[in-house]
């Protein structure tokens, strides 16, 4: 089972009500604004390593969302974070 977590050196900033991922050293090239579900996943991955199944169950328990939509949100979140070097597995 693949476990992922947020790497050290990244944090959230709240800019006018939008949560944005920033690198602590200023090297993140892209601005990443998190949706509500992405923010939830971020907070989940900051606390511990989790599997995709853990993420799915947490979203379904905390949001009024279908399994298909939740899986899509997870895939987009993971792809975006991986492309920007923010998560490790």
Give the positions of each predicted feature:
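Long, charge-rich, low-complexity alpha-helical segments
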Residues: 30-89
